[in-house]
């Protein structure tokens, strides 16, 4: 089997110490000096997180079949290293030990119960070669298995082995979960979908989850593709970590990583937490919509991402706010919640915006631009100075939807706009200019 020139091997080496060992193999390093960079942030979460701070050890070696020689690595800045001397034609291995004990969906985690990582937390970028096909090998761990949407090249029944991504950026868009899972499978509009759950002590109600999620996913596919009714991916995966108390999600092109309260899931032998389950379905809906709106329909400012510095856009009120509008609306359209329940959610969001003095101080465009330093770094003064581009963006979407319906006598709606965005910017992958939405 021939593998790409760039290969990463991830080994969950120290479960109790929460450490991954990562080997980066570079078949054709730059002989003038190979530069390596760790991302500073992850797409979808707009905060500089300095993932390099979790690297405990790093060393580089020139390797042959019979010997290896350690190479000198120079630290250039917080995220960057450079191999100073690389012989022409040599193969280089860079070996790192990375600490992983963050239960969020944004970084990496490892203990004796489970593992999870975004490749952006473990995998150094090889400057000048990030456009090349990239392999990821995951070393076996006991009775655990692997869940990810990366393309399998050579794996065992548990999923351990080699995976392939077309380039480095694509690799970063596929989170990986390790451990034992409760699995739910279904098809929505002919496309295979799965949800894998860790951390839930009771047996979940698989049939209830499959029925509800299938209906929600189909309603979202139909929102963007009312005629073709076809999803833009070959399969989709919900990676769920159920904990005592937690909430969050991070979107990816073919999957999402979710954090939820375990008692919000439907479980056999336990009463259903109605409000909590509704919140969980709304989270699933939100991140699933992102597979269209932000992962494929993107701000031009994100094409391509520069993961070393802040990437500013004034359009998060659209990409997050409109997603927030549709996440609950699709629960209603798919008949997962009643009309009164939906109206209660709209009223709650409306009241939250009206109660915040920050709505008088900051536009949603400025809130989007300042997300890195204000929304994602909230303090005691945030409600006085900041308006949520999620919440107010959802109200803008509601108002625009109603306005279009009134002016066209219900012939068109905000759905029409979303379908036009998908046709002109999603299918074509043409980035949306900062003033592009107004033109549409």
Go through the PLM ranges and name each one.
Residues 297-305, 310-390:
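Acidic/His/Gly-enriched intrinsically disordered linker/tail segments
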Residues 376-440:
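Amphipathic alpha-helical substructures
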Residues 288-289, 348-358, 420-425:
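Long, well-ordered core segments of solenoidal/helical folds
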Residues 1-41:
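Early extracytoplasmic/domain-onset interaction patches
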Residues 48-57, 64-215, 219-231, 245-246, ...:
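Non-catalytic architectural context of zinc metalloproteases
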Residues 182-316:
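Juxtacatalytic substrate-recognition/specificity segment
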Residues 218-226, 293, 331, 401-409, ...:
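Sec-exported extracytoplasmic/periplasmic mature domains
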């Amino acid at each position: 089997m021939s593998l790409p020139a760039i290969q990463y091997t991830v080994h969950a080496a120290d479960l109790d110490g929460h450490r991954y060992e990562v080997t980066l193999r570079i078949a054709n390093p730059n002989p003038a000096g190979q530069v390596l960079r760790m991302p500073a942030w992850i797409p979808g979460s707009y905060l500089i997180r300095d993932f390099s701070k979790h690297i405990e050890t790093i060393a580089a070696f020139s390797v042959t079949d019979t010997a290896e020689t350690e190479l000198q690595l120079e630290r250039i800045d917080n995220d960057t290293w450079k191999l100073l001397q690389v012989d022409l034609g040599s193969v280089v291995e860079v070996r790192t030990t990375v600490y992983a004990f963050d239960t969020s969906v944004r970084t990496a985690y490892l203990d004796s119960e489970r593992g999870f990582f975004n490749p952006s937390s473990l995998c150094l970028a090889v400057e000048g070669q990030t456009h090349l096909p990239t392999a990821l090998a995951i070393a076996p761990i006991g009775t655990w298995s692997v869940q990810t949407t990366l393309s399998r090249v050579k794996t065992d029944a548990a999923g351990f082995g080699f995976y392939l991504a077309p380039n480095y950026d694509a690799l970063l868009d596929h989170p990986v979960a390790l451990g034992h899972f409760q699995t739910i499978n279904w098809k929505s509009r002919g496309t295979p979908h799965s949800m894998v759950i860790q951390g839930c002590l009771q047996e979940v109600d698989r049939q209830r989850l499959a029925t509800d999620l299938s209906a929600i996913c189909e309603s979202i596919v139909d929102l963007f593709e009312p005629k073709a009714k076809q999803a833009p991916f070959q399969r989709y995966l919900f990676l769920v970590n159920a904990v005592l108390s937690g909430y969050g999600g991070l979107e990816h092109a073919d999957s999402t990583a979710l954090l939820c309260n375990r008692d919000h899931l439907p479980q056999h032998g336990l009463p259903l937490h109605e409000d909590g389950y509704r919140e969980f379905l709304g989270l699933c809906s939100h991140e699933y919509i992102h597979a269209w709106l932000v992962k494929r329909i993107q701000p031009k400012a994100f094409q391509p991402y520069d993961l070393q510095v802040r990437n500013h856009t004034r359009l998060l009120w659209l990409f997050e706010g409109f997603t927030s509008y549709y996440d609950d609306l699709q629960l209603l359209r798919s008949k997962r919640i009643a009309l009164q329940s939906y109206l209660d959610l709209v009223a709650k969001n409306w009241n939250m915006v009206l109660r915040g003095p920050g709505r008088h101080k900051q536009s949603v465009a400025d809130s989007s631009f300042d997300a890195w330093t204000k929304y994602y770094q909230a303090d005691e003064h945030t409600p006085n100075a900041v308006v949520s581009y999620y919440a107010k963006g959802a109200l803008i979407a509601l108002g625009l939807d109603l306005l279009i319906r009134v002016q066209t006598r219900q012939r068109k709606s905000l759905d029409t706009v979303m379908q036009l965005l998908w046709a002109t910017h999603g299918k074509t992958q043409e980035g949306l200019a900062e003033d592009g939405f107004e033109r549409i």
